[in-house]
Amino acid sequence: MKKLFLIIGAPGSGKTTDAELIAERNSDKIVHYSTGDLLRAEVASGSELGQTIKSYIDNGNLVPLEIVINTIKSAIEKAPKDIVLIDGFPRSVEQMKALDEMLKNTDDIELVSVIEVEVSEDVARERVLGRARGADDNVEVFNNRMKVFTEPLKDIQDFYSAQGKLIKINGERTIEEIVDEMEQVIKEKAGI
């Protein structure tokens, strides 16, 4: 049985870095995938599907749902470890519902917790525009990504809160503090 943890948060919240560090510290038990990495791997393969995905990502838009869900399900099932962290998902109510549906129809994956790394919009903007990592890191695209993140957020929080699965972590502290707390939560919930 794969134990799934979803790590959500605004662009620039640090969710990817946090999850990467936890997986590195616990490489014998935990594996981390960024939804973006899974999709970018497909893009890098140069496949027709990859080219389709690329056009969505380049414009800061969401990749079609069926593509994302199938990519995620496949990655979890093939994961070399039993505890899987995925960051950057779900990003919409539709994604959340489709993921929920997929999990209901899959016996070998259990969603344990959804961890939200909370940061203010000002902190997120400062971090993203200060890091200039790729072509999407300009103001207009940041604003689009922020809007894409915030619009469905309350519905996503409510959905997972009702299941007792939402855990919020303050993302405006040092990376050590954030990672230590998140790691503790994951280990506790996964029973390791």
From Swiss-Prot:
**Per UniProt, where does ATP bind?**
12-17, 131, 173
EC assignment: the record states 2.7.4.3
Cellular component GO terms held in the UniProt record: cytoplasm
Q: Which residues bind AMP?
A: 35, 40, 61-63, 88-91, 95, 133, 145
Q: Which UniProt keywords apply?
A: ATP-binding, Cytoplasm, Kinase, Nucleotide biosynthesis, Nucleotide-binding, Transferase
| Biochemical pathway | Purine metabolism; AMP biosynthesis via salvage pathway; AMP from ADP: step 1/1
Q: Locate the region LID.
A: 130-136
Q: Its quaternary structure?
A: Monomer.
| UniProt remark on domains | Consists of three domains, a large central CORE domain and two small peripheral domains, NMPbind and LID, which undergo movements during catalysis. The LID domain closes over the site of phosphoryl transfer upon ATP binding. Assembling and dissambling the active center during each catalytic cycle provides an effective means to prevent ATP hydrolysis.
Please report which protein family the annotation says this sequence is part of.
Answer: Belongs to the adenylate kinase family.
Function, as annotated: Catalyzes the reversible transfer of the terminal phosphate group between ATP and AMP. Plays an important role in cellular energy homeostasis and in adenine nucleotide metabolism.
Specify the protein name.
Answer: Adenylate kinase
Which organism encodes this protein? Nautilia profundicola (strain ATCC BAA-1463 / DSM 18972 / AmH)
* Organism placement in taxonomy: Bacteria, Pseudomonadati, Campylobacterota, Epsilonproteobacteria, Nautiliales
Q: Which gene encodes it?
A: adk
